[in-house]
A protein has these predicted regions:
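Structural/interface elements that position substrates and couple domains in central-metabolism enzymes
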Residues: 1-421
Length: 421
């Protein structure tokens, strides 16, 4: 295999495109967004933590971007990295996977490999990918190959993509071998599991584990706050135990595309088998509860100065769901911004990764990032720290903010000017 296609050039697809290019493949990046394709072909990065230099180096081996799905027929392997969101009712929304397969179907050819990397419920590959291929009169494992290999991308993380073990499940043994031959050229370790469903469930378990523990620690935080105890100090103390404890730190709520979404793919599928995933549903409830709790905390701190929300001036520090990246998908900061604005408050934000307010399917505001100075900080009744970006000047923030709600444990709380959130 010399030429591969990657469908979906976002936070997962772009790093993969770069990595395959670095390892001698000609990589074709498919995306319906023509602005992304244009930026790619100009060698311009559109994701903050990925340098343009990496894209330009990839182009030197002939890698490029396109929106023309007919080019599928020219590649040896197809890797699907499209979004898999949930509906308002927390049910799987697989429209992007279905659309990709419909568009690709006429251009599939004998000998190709398809790998689905998008996180989804167990059975998706067998229900949505394989039937489309078989409709083209291919035999899986003989003249066409299918695997599921979940993405494990951590935007802005310290561990390089190629150093993260690649999980892979094949529709047949021949499919698994074909998948290993592809991914083994890029990833240092490829772990073949016994079935596609095992691979699909592996990613769900990883994210369920984090979701449930974050739900637990945020509930713990809300109770500790009632007791007048600093949760951050409790977690730090517990983390000194060298066994049997993994530290999870509270925050303003779940964020990102994975944790607020993926666990509900599992709970939805569980109902098909007459089971209720109660821990997962409760963790989701805790995520909403902690956001509501933070709203109450804001009202409480404003009330200390006799200020109503409708006449308040509030600055939110950080729109990203995690530190040091330009990723605001499912960020609790966006929901909080909307709540303050909807209730008449004057709300602004500061985030070095978002000069302009990021538009999303749920929220869109015309706003730009506030430059942090002594003068700008003094204008606000309350500053709420939501994302622990390394580029924030924390001494400046502490010195010139009238009151701070800190959801990330940066400042020592004093219940006068600094409050835990």
């Amino acid at each position: 295999m010399k030429k591969i296609g990657i469908i979906g050039m976002g936070y997962v697809g772009l790093p993969l495109w770069i990595n395959f290019s670095k390892n001698g493949f000609q990589a074709v990046g498919f995306d319906a967004n023509k602005d992304i394709v244009s930026a790619l072909n100009k060698g311009q990065s559109y994701i903050g933590h990925i340098p343009s230099e990496d894209i330009n180096e990839s182009m030197k081996v002939g890698s490029y971007g396109t929106s023309d799905m007919s080019e599928i027929q020219s590649v040896d392997a197809i890797i699907i990295c499209v979004p898999t969101p949930i509906s308002k009712n927390r049910e799987p929304d697989l429209q992007y996977v279905k659309s990709v397969m419909r568009q690709a179907a006429p251009f599939l050819r004998k000998g190709q490999l398809i790998s689905l990397e998008s996180t989804t419920y167990p059975g998706t590959t067998e229900e949505l990918i394989i039937p489309v291929i078989e409709e083209q009169n291919f035999t899986i494992g003989r003249d066409f190959y299918v695997v599921y290999s979940p993405e494990r991308e951590n935007p802005g993380g310290d561990i390089r993509q190629e150093n993260i073990t690649k999980i892979l499940g094949g529709a047949t043994k021949a499919c698994a071998q074909k998948g290993h031959a592809l991914y083994g050229k890029v990833f240092k370790e490829v772990n073949i599991v016994s079935s596609i469903k095992i691979a699909e469930l592996t990613k769900l378990l990883e994210n369920i584990h984090r979701a449930v523990n974050l739900g637990m620690i945020n509930e713990f935080k809300m109770i500790c706050d009632k007791m007048g105890v600093d949760t951050m100090e409790v977690v730090d103390a517990a983390a000194t135990k060298p066994f049997g404890f993994v530290p999870y730190y509270p925050g303003p709520g779940w964020g990102g595309h994975c944790i607020p979404v993926d666990p509900f793919y599992f709970s939805w599928k569980a109902k098909e088998f007459g089971m209720n995933a109660r821990f997962i549903e409760l963790a989701g409830e805790m995520n909403l509860n902690v956001q509501d709790w933070l709203q109450d905390k804001i009202l409480h701190v404003l009330n200390l100065d006799g200020i109503a929300l409708s006449s308040s001036k509030i600055l939110l520090l950080g729109l990203s769901y995690k530190e040091n990246v330009d990723d605001a998908r499912e960020s609790p900061s966006l929901r909080l911004y909307d709540w303050i604005s909807s209730n008449g408050g004057h709300v602004k934000y500061s985030d070095p990764h978002f000069p302009k307010f990021p538009s999303s399917m749920k929220y869109s505001f015309k706003d730009s990032s506030v430059k942090l100075t002594s003068a700008s900080l003094k204008k606000f009744d309350l500053v709420v720290l939501l994302t622990k970006h390394k580029d924030f000047d924390y001494p400046l923030i502490k010195k010139y903010s009238k009151r701070i709600i800190d959801t990330r444990g940066v400042f020592a709380p004093n219940q006068k000017t600094v409050f835990r959130g």
